[in-house]
């Protein structure tokens, strides 16, 4: 029993013990959490006191400095990173808009990037106005670190081997300054503005932020900070330094210089190590912005090093733990820098020197501040020399009467620049104006740096009013109501934070000259901002308003012109050609053509050509040419053609041609010809014909013909014929003819013929004939010709042709032609021709022909004929002749005139017809054989 009780008691005692342990554990966790919260609050509040101690270079603050750089990278500070990220995003409007002194038509200068540098900006807080939009911890954190310049905000940023990883200001800032939560101070001092008043603005903004957390001991946080790093400036290798600028820098025209750096980091570098970049005192890194900041060096999306500006204006970079895990780290950096108005007050040559360690770069530039604007006795110039977009303030400095002229009843007005969406607020609540008198014009600095202590403050003696919205007015109220010395007017104003416009101001000086003529002179200032990129800079330019009474002339202000001339031309051409040609060409042509051409040609030509042509053509051609030509051509042509041609030609030609032609042609041709001809012809003909012929012929002919003919004919013919023929002929002929014919005929015939013939003949003939013939013929022929021709022709033709030809020609031609043609041609030609022709013809023809012929002939003929005919009047029943060489079977509906030799003439006509049909059949067969191949 007792044993059981003991066991029961022991179990109960054990249960009570477990519960006690659990309760105690929970209470312990609660106490620990409370202490951690207190520590967090203390660390932020302690930054406030630490920021002031940093000015005395406390040793503990130096040892804590490295933590400023990389806490964001650490995973153990996640909550701090979030707060800081929110802070920097809220500070977006206050990012590094480094602007140079700005004047008329100010231009925005974005930060240039070289090498691997990527342009970006960071948005760390400078003033309580921005930090109030962040979380409580981050807010107090940034407020206290403003004087420590741990914020990393400037114009450019360099990435290590990652030029493509450009980040905007918001992203960069989320990875910075978290370390200030645990780092009360830094070994770098606050950024120094070149203007004493700038310092006041920044310090005042910081000090107005009252800490919300209770203070605690500095040692409590310093114990957690790592020891200070080593200056490894002289251990950097492959250091490059460059100064990029023109030979002249115009500070009041957005002028600046670029400082370029590159280096390799030793593998022994660790987190907290630093290096130093020396910046010449003649430059500053802020332009006209109120504070100067430098970019962090980024490696992709990680911070490699953070930078601050020390009291001497040099840049100190501190490495993060990125270098602990990487070897062969390389970096490039580009920073824009501006001429410092305090250290460079006059126009002149300045030598700039910058470097990393023992590696330096030097460059001498001419600093040109340019002169004020002057109009008669009025002179004025202004500049916006300070912008604080965090507090939405600006400062404008205006030189009134810098020339020291006598101005009677002077009045200065300030307005928003006309025709702009200026964001300035000009009224009694938002604008403060100071006026200083300058006894000697030589005391004015050309850089517009003003030390108020050097001049007499006459603000209380002048009359300052705001007569209209967004306008102020300054009346100088001198005893004699005139000024003879310069005055400085300093305007401290505000910017409308809700406006999307840029800062644009106009200052105007009014006054009388000694002739009591009222005049005015204006000066415009403008600054444009580029959020998240670089700087905003201005361009100075005087503006002369319209004058109520103007005896003199105003020098015109040059304007910029923007022109974009453009021409559109397009051509579609596919050609494969090999050509060997020598040509002398003189041409006078006006042409309007649209062409689509596909050609493959091999051509060997030597030509002499003199041509004057006017041509209007639209052509579609597909050609495959192999031509060998030697031509001398003298042509004067006027042609208007519309042609479609498909040709495949092999030609070897040697031609001399003299032609004067006017042609207007529209033709469709489909031809297949094989011709070999040798002819000498001298003809002078006048023909006027109107024919309608419908023929259907199939001809297959094989002919051997040896002809030698000399023909001298002079004919005038006027014929009107209608012929309809259907012929089938099969002939085999051998002909050998030698004919001399001399005919002079005048014929006027009107014939209608309709013939249908079937002939099969085999003949050998040797004939000598004298014939007088009157014929109208419609023929389809294949010819081989060698001709010399001299022609003068006027032709008007409309043809459709499809040709396949192989030609070799040697021709001397002289032609004068007027032609109107519209052609569609599809040709494949192989021709061998040698021709000498001299012709003078006037022809006007209108023909409709449809022919289909089937003929097969084989003829050998040997003929010798001599004919001497005298010309008789038309319609004469006797001795009427037709000098035509055409062969045609005709069935006359009217009795033919008595020629005196009917049997012999009919026999010759029949044999000629048979020979013609035979040749047609022969060449048709050749064509079919060729097509089959």
From Swiss-Prot:
Signal peptide: 1-39
Low complexity bias: start-end ranges: 47-65, 106-132, 143-162, 566-598, 862-880
Domain of life: Bacteria
Matching Pfam families: Big_8, Gram_pos_anchor, SdrG_C_C, YSIRK_signal
SUPFAM superfamilies recorded: Bacterial adhesins
List of residues that carry Pentaglycyl murein peptidoglycan amidated threonine: 899
Residue ranges annotated as propeptide in the record: 900-933
Membrane topology: Peptidoglycan-anchor
Main location per the UniProt record: secreted
Region (Ligand binding A region) location: 40-542
SS bonds (residue pairs): none
Family per similarity comment: Belongs to the serine-aspartate repeat-containing protein (SDr) family.
Full protein name: Clumping factor A
Name of the encoding gene: clfA
């Amino acid at each position: 029993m007792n044993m059981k009780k003991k066991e029961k008691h022991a179990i109960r005692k054990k249960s009570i013990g477990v519960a006690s342990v659990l309760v105690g554990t929970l209470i312990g966790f609660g106490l620990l959490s409370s202490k951690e919260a207190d520590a967090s609050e203390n660390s932020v509040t302690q930054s406030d006191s630490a920021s002031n101690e940093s000015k005395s270079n406390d040793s503990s603050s130096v040892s804590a400095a490295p933590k400023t750089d990389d806490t964001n990278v650490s995973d153990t500070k996640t909550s701090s990173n979030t707060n800081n990220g929110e802070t920097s995003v809220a500070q977006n409007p206050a990012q590094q808009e480094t602007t140079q002194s700005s004047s008329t038509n100010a231009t925005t200068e974005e930060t240039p990037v070289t090498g691997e540098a990527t342009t970006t900006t960071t948005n760390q807080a400078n003033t309580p106005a921005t930090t109030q939009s962040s979380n409580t911890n981050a807010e107090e954190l940034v407020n206290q670190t403003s004087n420590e310049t741990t914020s990393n905000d400037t114009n450019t940023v360099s990435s290590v081997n990652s030029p493509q990883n450009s980040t905007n200001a918001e992203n960069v800032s989320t990875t910075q300054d978290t370390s200030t939560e645990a780092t009360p101070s830094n070994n770098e001092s606050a950024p120094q503005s070149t203007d004493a008043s700038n310092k006041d603005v920044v310090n005042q903004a910081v000090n107005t932020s009252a800490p919300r957390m209770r203070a605690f001991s500095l040692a409590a946080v310093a114990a957690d900070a790592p020891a200070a790093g080593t200056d490894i400036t002289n251990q950097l290798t492959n250091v490059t330094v460059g100064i990029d600028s023109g030979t002249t820098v115009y500070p009041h025209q957005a002028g600046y210089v670029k400082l370029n750096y590159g280096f390799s980091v030793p593998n022994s570098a660790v987190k907290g190590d630093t290096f130093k970049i020396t910046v010449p005192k003649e430059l500053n890194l802020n332009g006209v912005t109120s504070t100067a900041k430098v970019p962090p060096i980024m490696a992709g999306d990680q911070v490699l090093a953070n930078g601050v500006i020390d009291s001497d204006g040099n840049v100190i970079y501190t490495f993060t733990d990125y270098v602990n895990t990487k070897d062969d780290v390389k970096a490039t950096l580009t920073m824009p820098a501006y001429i410092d108005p305090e250290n460079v007050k006059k126009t002149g040559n300045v030598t700039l020197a910058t470097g990393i360690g023992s590696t330096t770069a030097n460059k001498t530039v001419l600093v040109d501040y340019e002169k004020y604007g002057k109009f008669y006795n009025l002179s004025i110039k202004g500049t916006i020399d300070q912008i604080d977009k965090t507090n939405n303030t600006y400062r404008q400095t205006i030189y009134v009467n810098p020339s020291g002229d006598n101005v009677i009843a002077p009045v200065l007005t300030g307005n928003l620049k006309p025709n702009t969406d200026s964001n300035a607020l000009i009224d009694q609540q938002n604008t403060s104006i100071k006026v200083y008198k300058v006894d000697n014009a030589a005391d004015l600095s050309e850089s517009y740096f003003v030390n108020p202590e050097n001049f007499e403050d006459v603000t209380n003696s002048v009359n300052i009013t705001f007569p209209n919205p967004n306008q102020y007015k300054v009346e100088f109220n001198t005893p004699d109501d005139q000024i003879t010395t310069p005055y400085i007017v300093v305007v401290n104003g505000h910017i409308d934070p809700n406006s999307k416009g840029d800062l644009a101001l106009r200052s105007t000086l009014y006054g009388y000259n000694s002739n009591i003529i009222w005049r005015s002179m204006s000066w415009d200032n403008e600054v444009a901002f580029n959020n998240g990129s670089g700087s905003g800079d201005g361009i100075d330019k005087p503006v002369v308003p319209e004058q109520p009474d103007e005896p003199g002339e105003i020098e015109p202000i040059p304007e910029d012109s923007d022109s974009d001339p453009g021409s559109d031309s397009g051509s579609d051409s596919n050609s494969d050609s090999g050509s060997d040609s020598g040509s002398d060409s003189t041409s006078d042509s006006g042409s309007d053509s649209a062409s689509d051409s596909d050609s493959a040609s091999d051509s060997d030509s030597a030509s002499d050509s003199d041509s004057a042509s006017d041509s209007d053509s639209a052509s579609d051609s597909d050609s495959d040419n192999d031509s060998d030509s030697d031509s001398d051509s003298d042509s004067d042509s006027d042609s208007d053609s519309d042609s479609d041609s498909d040709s495949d030609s092999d030609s070897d030609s040697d031609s001399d041609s003299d032609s004067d032609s006017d042609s207007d042609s529209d033709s469709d041709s489909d031809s297949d010809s094989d011709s070999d001809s040798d002819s000498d012809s001298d003809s002078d003909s006048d023909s006027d014909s109107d024919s309608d012929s419908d023929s259907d012929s199939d001809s297959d002919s094989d002919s051997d013909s040896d002809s030698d003919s000399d023909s001298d004919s002079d004919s005038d013919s006027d014929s009107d014929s209608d012929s309809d023929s259907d012929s089938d002929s099969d002939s085999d002929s051998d002909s050998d003819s030698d004919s001399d014919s001399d005919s002079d005929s005048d014929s006027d015939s009107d014939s209608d013929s309709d013939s249908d013939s079937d002939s099969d003949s085999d003949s050998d003939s040797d004939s000598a004939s004298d014939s007088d013939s009157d014929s109208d013929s419609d023929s389809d022929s294949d010819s081989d010709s060698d001709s010399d021709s001299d022609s003068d022709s006027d032709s008007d033709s409309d043809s459709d042709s499809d040709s396949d030809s192989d030609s070799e020609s040697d021709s001397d031609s002289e032609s004068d032609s007027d032609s109107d043609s519209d052609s569609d041609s599809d040709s494949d030609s192989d021709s061998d021709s040698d021709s000498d022709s001299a012709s003078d013809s006037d022809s006007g023809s209108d023909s409709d022909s449809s022919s289909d012929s089937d003929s097969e002939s084989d003829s050998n003929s040997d003929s010798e004929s001599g004919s001497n005919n005298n010309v008789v009047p038309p319609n004469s029943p006797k001795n009427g002749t037709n000098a035509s060489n055409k062969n045609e079977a005709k069935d006359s509906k009217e009795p033919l005139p008595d020629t005196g030799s009917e049997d012999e003439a009919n026999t010759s006509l029949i044999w000629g017809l048979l020979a013609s049909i035979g040749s047609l059949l022969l060449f048709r067969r050749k064509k079919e054989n060729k097509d089959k191949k």
